[in-house]
């Protein structure tokens, strides 16, 4: 089973991608798909779901001026 070829779907376009050294952008099929995904995260079109009911800023503490 060492030589088993693992194939995954590109998260952006769905193309088949071989999971190995020959696919430098894995799990993406290309640099283009990788950058599209990065842009979606940067524009907050994608986010990690949370059950938090408060703002993250509520947990921030003031900087201690020593």
Swiss-Prot record:
Gene Ontology MF terms in the entry: DNA topoisomerase type II (double strand cut, ATP-hydrolyzing) inhibitor activity; zinc ion binding
Cofactor: Zn(2+)
One Pfam family recorded for the sequence: YacG
Domain of life, source organism: Bacteria
Gene3D superfamilies with a match to the protein in the record: Erythroid Transcription Factor GATA-1, subunit A (3.30.50.10)
BP term (GO), one: regulation of DNA-templated transcription
Cofactor note: Binds 1 zinc ion.
Residues that, per the record, bind Zn(2+): 10, 13, 29, 33
Keywords associated with the record: Metal-binding, Zinc
Keyword Iron-sulfur: no
Record-linked InterPro entries: DNA_gyrase_inhibitor_YacG, Znf_NHR/GATA
Subunit relationships: Interacts with GyrB.
Function noted in UniProt: Inhibits all the catalytic activities of DNA gyrase by preventing its interaction with DNA. Acts by binding directly to the C-terminal domain of GyrB, which probably disrupts DNA binding by the gyrase.
Family: Belongs to the DNA gyrase inhibitor YacG family.
Name this polypeptide is given: DNA gyrase inhibitor YacG
């Amino acid at each position: 089973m060492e030589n088993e070829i693992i194939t995954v779907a590109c998260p952006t376009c769905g193309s088949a991608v071989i999971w190995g050294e020959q696919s430098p952008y894995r799990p993406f099929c290309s640099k283009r798909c990788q950058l599209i995904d990065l842009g979606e995260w940067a524009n907050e079109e994608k986010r990690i779901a949370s059950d938090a009911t408060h703002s993250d800023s509520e947990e921030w503490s003031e900087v201690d001026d020593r």
